[in-house]
Amino acid sequence: FAWNNLALAELRDLNRHRTGNRFTPLIQAGFYLPPEIDRAPHAALLADQLELTRALLERSSPAYVYSLLLGAQTPFEHSTHADKFIYEAELRTGLGAHFRYAGHLSAALHAFFAQVPEARDWVVEGTAEPE
């Protein structure tokens, strides 16, 4: 499964303790701010960060990754076996799951169900209700 807009903060957590292969090019493809946060007060910071990142990339500097903020979104790919994916999807959509993880894993789980419809009977998708 893959996402084209996973924030670095989420990637950092999802990348831990998981089986399979994970890949991200660490190229910024957007920036996540919660809907209730007004982007306007942060526009100058985000513009400066974008300018710095572009300048470092134009120089082919590997240091560009240090210009990425935790809200920077990047493509993320994760290949794994079905049993490990099901475990992760149930865990990340279950009780107390972070709403962003739950949204990402719910979408991936629905794509999985489209390919393996018989799995619906034995895979439990949670509702990410708070503990």
Regions found by a protein language model. Give the residues of each.
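Family-specific signature for flavin-dependent thymidylate synthase
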Residues: 2-131
